[in-house]
Amino acid sequence: AFFHLAWAHTIGAGRNDMPAQIENIRYTIDAVRTAAAMGCRVFVGTGSQAEYGRVDGVLRADTPTNPENGYGMAKLCAGQMSRTEAAALGMDHVWARILSVYGPHDGPNTMISATIQKLLAGQCPDLTAGEQKWDYLYSADAADALYRMACHGRSGAVYPVGSGTARPLREYIETLRDAIDLALPLGLGKIPYGPQQVMFLQADITKLAADTGFAPRTAFADGIRATIAWAKTQKQTN
């Protein structure tokens, strides 16, 4: 199996850098051809919830796609083109539309990572009101989902990947804070929602579970403690 997770220009203005996003599509096709040349039988590509745009309901494989930025547009195109290329090369293809993943080794610019760093420094993080309903999946569980997709996924399938449950974002943030120090303040409501703020994000993992046997195993409280522990080791070495 070949797992393609690489992607450039994933944050900020880079998400609408159209020439750069087109290069990401090209790299995905290159990855398919490389996988075939290596003798791989299945190509597992990682897409994004950004392929859907803003949706009020639970995300399924057949939920209409209406991406609102170049990143989401390119992910959608890469999934479609790589599926066609894989078929032409006689290779199975599975596409994961990943929602929000957290865990050790996460990038510093995610909301989870930035909030952890602020709280570990004893500072009050500036946040939105946290009313968004969100679906978070621990990184080890996400890796398990991709592995199961390679082993048991249906060729040509698209699988939304998440925990399958949604909670208000402020609840996740409060759980995170409580794992560090109950007394630390949170700046909930200090940042306004952006013009394209997604207010509901939840994956329907019914098909993923049926086809592959996947089930999330890590509660957020446990996963965030492991993430904080890792962040503390990074703070000590820097």
Segments and roles (model prediction):
Residues 70, 74-77:
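Active-site helix of classical SDR
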Residues 57, 80-135, 139-148, 173-179:
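NAD(P)-dependent short-chain dehydrogenase/reductase
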Residues 9-13, 34-42, 152-153:
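A short helix-coil junction within the Rossmann-fold of NAD(P)-dependent oxidoreductases
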Residues 12-19, 54-59, 107-108, 130:
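Conserved catalytic-core motifs of eukaryotic protein kinase domains, centered on the activation segment
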Residues 1-23:
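NAD(P)H-binding glycine-rich loop region in Rossmannoid oxidoreductase-like domains
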Residues 4, 42-45, 53, 94-100, ...:
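Structural signature of the Rossmann-like NAD(P)-dependent dehydrogenase/reductase core
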Residues 120-238:
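C-terminal substrate-binding subdomain of Rossmann-fold SDR/epimerase-dehydratase oxidoreductases
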Residues 4, 29-70:
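Conserved Rossmann-fold NAD(P)-dependent oxidoreductase catalytic core, especially the SDR/UDP-sugar
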